[in-house]
Amino acid sequence: MIDAVVSEHVNAPADRVQALYRNPDNWARLFPATIRGARVVRREGDTTVVEVDHVEGKVVNILRDISPTRIDLVEFKRRYDATFVNEFIPEGEAMRYTLTASVRLKWPYRLAAPFVKPLVLARMRRYVVEPLKAAAESQR
């Protein structure tokens, strides 16, 4: 298991950043380097199942609203399964976005686990945190 955390101050209200992230219709625009499109398959209470047209092919993501400041995303891919905890903590008129990942590599990729954490951190920052921050801050 690889555990990684990236935290960033965002100059936008927490509810704006959450709304961007929570809506899969935004994902292709927010995360164009990795996502071509996304469609909601079903909603049940606080859970949304999303089919994502990812650069690696079609994958399933499950979004769960855990609390007013937290959204979890479970992702199933060919090389790994991962849980991402997204925390949106207000800081005055801005917020702190913290993304925590728990990544379970599949065989044979599991053998590389001791060397993969820096790559996981870099991709979290480049493909999720930075694009989400840029989109939220540009909506002023």
What are these regions (language model features)?
Residues 7-8, 49-56, 66-67, 97, ...:
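A general structural signal for short secondary-structure boundary/capping elements
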Residues 28-31, 37-79, 83, 127-140:
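Glycine-rich portal/gate segments that line the openings of hydrophobic small-molecule binding cavities
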